[in-house]
Amino acid sequence: HCFSYDNNKYITFLAKTNGTFNIGDDVVNSYMMFNNFHTGRDKSSILTTNISVWCSNTFLNAMKDNSQFKIGITHRVEYSSELDSLIKHKLETALRSNEEYKEQATTLDNKQIVENDLLKYFILVYNPKLLPSYEKEGAGYKALNSVEGSNLTQIKRCYGVWHDTIESNGKSFKLQNTGNNVRNDTYWKAFNCVTYNEDHLRGGSDNVSSRLKNNFFTNGKDNIKTKAMDTALELAVA
């Protein structure tokens, strides 16, 4: 697969590996990812990403430790045998990390989640400072209307994704291809609500370049998907 965006300044190539795994009926494929830039300043990069078959959600497992996995190559560097060996070593390490991602996904899928804990999770991901006010207001979705702070829109959107809906201009619309139909009410499903929001909703449906850059370079705005995974794991094993 190849994606060109931001007036052809950014090009991303995806090559499927043999790292596919299943969580029940949910299917996650693993890809090698090569990012090339025509900006005059950015380095080309090589890393890996995991993509859900059902909803095209992405998760850059390698983003959690750029020094371990990510390789940056300028256009001025000559491709030598030493560089070739380095790249192969880094790619092998990154592919092994996909096994870790499978274990994490399994852990999340083994922990059921209820409505109030679901909202608490989204708050902890997007703005933990809201939690005291949210709990003071009695928790539950209605409590969010009495809470003030940043990223409330993202929290509400994730909650909507859980229920396959999105609100816009006072109206509710049905979301398609969320992957909820193949997931149980677990932290794995909750985590995927965050990745769906970051990949498909945040930034607006008319700003494809912005969303693709979020998907392929930062693991969601401010690397939020990594935080979502770490938070879900903490709650799932508590």
Label each region the model flagged.
Residues 12-13, 32:
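A broad, low-specificity signal marking well-ordered, structured residues that form hydrophobic/aromatic
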Residues 1-12, 18-20:
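N-terminal "first-domain core" detector
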